[in-house]
């Protein structure tokens, strides 16, 4: 290798970071939200805490919007990164696969940002 030649920088750490964050979010936070929305609220546990007005007020506040974005964006990046590498492991070669999968995740993220901030 020539002394003047710099090694090629990889963009993979960025995607692995989003993959890891999405995996942790999906494993820790999502089950709690599923229990809350799928079991506790329908059973009527603490109905005064989970009224429509309070949930809408939370989701329209800054912290609520960030929470909604994290609930949407991080699992999407995790899933598309996992699909990308699973196809690679199975020797299914998608042309320009980085652009396809990470581009799709970026587009979905932008759509989520627009959707959450127009809520």
Curated annotation (Swiss-Prot):
Its main location: membrane. SUPFAM superfamilies: Fumarate reductase respiratory complex transmembrane subunits (SSF81343). It is found in: Cell inner membrane. It is a multi-pass membrane protein. GO terms for cellular component: fumarate reductase complex; plasma membrane. The keyword Cell membrane applies. The chain crosses the membrane at residues 27-47, 61-81, 99-119. It comes from the Bacteria. Two distinct, membrane-bound, FAD-containing enzymes are responsible for the catalysis of fumarate and succinate interconversion; fumarate reductase is used in anaerobic growth, and succinate dehydrogenase is used in aerobic growth. Anchors the catalytic components of the fumarate reductase complex to the cell inner membrane, binds quinones. Part of an enzyme complex containing four subunits: a flavoprotein (FrdA), an iron-sulfur protein (FrdB), and two hydrophobic anchor proteins (FrdC and FrdD). HAMAP family: Fumarate_red_D (MF_00709). Belongs to the FrdD family. This is Fumarate reductase subunit D. It comes from Proteus mirabilis (strain HI4320). The gene is frdD.
